[in-house]
Amino acid sequence: MAKDGRPSNLPLLYNPLLNCIFNNPNHSRAPYKQIIHELASRHTDFTIIVPPSSLLHNSYDPESLKSSSKIALHDLAYHNEEFIRSHIVKTGSNSHAFLAPVAKVQSAIYNTICGKQILVKNGMIFTGKGFRRSLRAKITDIGYFDSFCDYFPSGSKFMLIYIDNSLYGSSDHPEPALEASPKAQQAKIKRPDQVPTESITFERLLRNFPLLSKSVSDPFYQLFHHNNYQFRVLRTNTHKKLSVIKSEFDNMLEEAYQIISNSVKSDSPDGEQTNNLLHQILRSYPELDLNKLVHEYVEINLYDKLWAQLIFQFSANAGLADPDATKIFTAEKYDELSCLSLNQLDIPVDEPWLLNDLLLRVYNAIIELSKLADATIIESSSKLKIISNTISILTENSNSSLMIDADTLIGLLIMVVVHSKIDFIEAHLYYIKNFMYGTISDDGYLSFIISSFDAVFFHLSHPDEPQYADMKESSQKNFEFWSLIRSHKVDEITALLEETDKLYGDKLPHNHFLKARNINGESALMLAIRSKNYDTFLLLLSRNPNWFSIEDILFDRNTTTSQNLLMVSLMEETKIITKILIEILGSCTLEEQIAYINSTDYSGRSVGHYLFHDYELINEVGHLVNWELKDHNSYTPLFNICRCYDHYAYYDLIKTAFSAVMSPNFNFKKHTDKYGNSILHILLKGIDQSGLLKADKNINVNCTNSKCLTPLTVYVKYGRIENLISLLQDKRLEFMFEDKKNFFNIFDYVAFSSRKQGDNDRGNSEEITSFIYSHYFKHFIPLKCTTVAFNAKFDTTKKDWIVYFHGNQNIILGLDSIKQSHHSFKLKNPHSLIPDVEKVWLNYPANGSVAPIFAKFRMNRLLENLNIFLVCLSMHPNFDTAPHETLGLSSSGNSSSLDQMKEVIGKQESSSKVTPHQLAEIETFLSLSKENLLGTLSTTIKFNKLMTVMNIKMGDLNTIREDSLYSAKMLCDMTPSIKTNYHTPDYGYRTMFQYFIWVELTLIEIIRNVNKVLGRITDWRQCHDRVLSLAGELRKYEDKRHELGTDEHSNSSWFGNIIENKRTRYKKLVLLHSEETKKLGLLSNEIKISHEDIAAEMSHYLMFRSKLIPFAIKQFTRVATTGLNRNGLHVLQ
């Protein structure tokens, strides 16, 4: 023993709690004795809560941190009975669990074996009554632990729930209390001074302070009432000067201020209290301007009337009462300038990349300014904020070195106003200048904003000015030229270009319509592509090559979508134009080509994302594409290509794309979308053409998406037969993979798919089902096992699991019926090496309840156990033809248990004699066989323990390696992956153990039968001795009978009584001798039949073992090699 009490002579398990329970040499001593006894007696009624191994090794009990000596959690796990009992939960049928009434919510309250309570709900465990603190721990995994110790039943499995913390908490993983105290809750409530000043309005003050509302509500109601004759001017639609409207508003504002003043006068009701209240508010918010709040309150209540008056005045151009109410931007003017381009406004920007920047600013500014037309914008401050934001968008310098001067700003603002097409924009500006709180002239920036808009209005208010005429003419020329492109009028375009060439030659003016771009930033070249006008596109490029420089072409893009010419050409599928653009791109440097191809649009997509429109282009530009670049949906170009399910040449598309992508540096994980789908998940067909499965590394064929679907389950779910066939042949495939969320396996998805398929898809579904079942029978089941269990569901009416069998016969049976058939078989064949029902179903007792999260997982293991049972039956010589009949899986009915017992008894009562010599031979044979079987059993038990421990230690090794990598990343200031606490996976040893345990169970069964017969032999000898003794006594009576024969008719009464007593004694001896002789005959018959049966079963055992062990090794090799292939270790030399 080590100093700390832990065993030093056994292979320690890395998790201290599991090591204490399953690998404890002191299990028969306190404090472990009672715990071990409870677990051993009803191991299926308990579930062990397992904290992370690293946490137990490296953390302390939080309660001990305040004391002078800290207590490590691993010491509690080894020595503290309460800690151990607190992590063992009663989940059996007698655990008194309170389940949630809603089935979708997996929640239940359970008691630990020390009387504490936990709540299991929605993947979390919450500590409750009895625990020192209210904590919560996340459930990270569940599983079964195969026991290998001698003090638990052989082959027993214990349910484990893995969590991310201990139920005592830990020093490295602090958890807050579930419910805050009332004081803490009160502290979270915002105090008045925490309310932002900007969010305070006068209306809010009225709601929050009833005293203030009581003082001013009635006067304000009268002020804003429609019958208020004093301000009737605002309610009559007559032509009037704008100053009159402004004056009426000012008067109402003064009335509002007076209402506030009157409310705080000492002679008014509650005046003093109202005054004190307002002073208290102002002290709490020193930055609050009460006059501003009142102004905004009046403005909100009068907005509808004010705005209606302004609209009426600005609409009456024929009978204007005020020159300031002139409507400049009419619908006609907007139409006249609708095609105006930025290059035609004397903006000193020639570089195409800077022009793109300005066009994008204009587009964003148009969106912002268009908010003025929103009917919910009813305050001058909101309107001012909109035009202020518009100016800020145009002048921002965050991503550009371009400086915007005043003249440039006016030009940009003209574009914004003209293309936003806001009706009555003049009224909006007038409202801002005349109805806002304060004076604009006091703020220099606001004055600059307003003056900028005034300048735009001035420039566009004089249609007779040459500047406006030029803009109108330019807009008209743009419209006519773009219309020619869209209508494919090549002859007219040719004549127009010839005329332009004669007029300007190589040097086009900056404001020429050939260089014009619409509000989306689309040039004539872009419009030609959009309209699929190849002739015009070629004509524009070839008429005079000096008109469009290489920079003009490379930076020609739709500024709203950021799509360049090549992207649009691919989208429009204009292959000839695409080819021309590729030729032009070939004249650039390699760096320029890569930058152009991988520049992204508004959705984050590059040219590579659109190559599926012309997949032959991949061979030319594939080497330039960044295939790992993700768009906003996390699609890489390769991922996007694979999703083109309706492509006319999908196979060629996939083959071409993967031939360009696949290389030794190909990273499979990079091509995953935000839902966790890999390329294998979304590939419709052509998996062989892709060559993905031929890659030696980086390909995880078992990866799951956010819905816990693997590529295999996706192919089954969506009927992708071609991919399914190819994937089933891959050595890395985990065919029986179960997701960690619902524990569905491939057979569940086959069942789901079969139920969802309609009549048209039924043939496809049946074909998929056939492939899945055939693969399972080929790789997981021996040839002679023709029927296995695939699915099950719980029947609430029968309170039993209904099992679905598939094979030569498709049968549905209840689990209880299967167990009864097994029991009947054992009654009929008491000496069969097939174990008893209790041994086979040791871990799955009848009516055994488990935690809700364990239900599906436990059912999967039960089906697994049932199939292994069927496999073992198929390897028994007596069941070569139909092993499934043993469990009642045949069409013929089984006889009852009573009939089976009568048949066995009748067989045993048949006459048969065994001589002592024969008996000695039988005894010698059985004794020698028992000795050999015990030696084999001892070796088998050791081997099974080794298999179990080996699988656990492999998991421990992997856990230690992950913990080491986590610590190393923390030391290197890297972002480590989240530490996990998962169930030990199967490294192949668990699979081998599941079959080798049957060798152990059959040996135990044969030895038990041998011991039973040896006991019968002892009974036979004792009975034989009694028969000989009784026969000797009978001979003595018969000899004395002749001596007493002469006195038989004596009249002496006393002498006659003696003779009568001897006769009675003689009769009793005869009867006793007859009974013992009959019993001896039965024993002889039973021993002979049992001997023959056991001898046959020993022969069957040798044949059974010779078949089972190679099959078990084959399954071990399959699981182990699958893991090696999955991890890429098969390439190591």
UniProtKB/Swiss-Prot annotation:
It comes from Meyerozyma guilliermondii (strain ATCC 6260 / CBS 566 / DSM 6381 / JCM 1539 / NBRC 10279 / NRRL Y-324). InterPro entries: Ankyrin_rpt-contain_sf, UPF0507/Ank_repeat_27, VPS9, VPS9_dom_sf. Residues 324-469 form the VPS9 domain. This is UPF0507 protein PGUG_02975. One of its GO terms (biological process) is early endosome to late endosome transport. One of its GO terms (cellular component) is early endosome. Pfam families: VPS9. Belongs to the UPF0507 family. GO terms for molecular function: guanyl-nucleotide exchange factor activity; SNARE binding.
